[in-house]
């Protein structure tokens, strides 16, 4: 299961083809890919983080700083994780961190 909450960031990125954007992936795409390809929460965290860094992450299109990042709760039957994801200062990658939640 993956749940999300939109939050603030110090950087804003735009999708490719929109306002000169260079980022390819939003949280909806990242979560869909993770749900399709991962069998564990840990694997989903690692995949989302790597894809965001490699291909760029953008928050809500047209959002100011207040909607440019996401926090994801990622849970399986064994582990729970919280992942925070935001664009980097170039608009073409991402900065992320994750913490396992004690169960």
Predicted regions, residues:
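N-terminal nucleophile
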Residues: 1-103
């Amino acid at each position: 299961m993956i749940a999300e909450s939109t939050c603030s960031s110090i950087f804003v990125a735009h999708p490719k083809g929109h306002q000169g954007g260079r980022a390819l992936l939003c949280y909806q795409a990242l979560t869909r890919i993770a749900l399709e390809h991962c069998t564990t929460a840990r694997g989903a965290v690692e995949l989302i983080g790597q894809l965001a860094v490699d291909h760029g992450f953008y928050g809500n299109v047209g959002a100011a700083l207040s909607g440019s990042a996401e926090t994801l709760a990622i849970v399986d039957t064994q582990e729970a994780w919280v992942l925070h994801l935001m664009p980097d200062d170039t608009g073409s990658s991402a900065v992320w961190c994750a913490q396992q939640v004690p169960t």
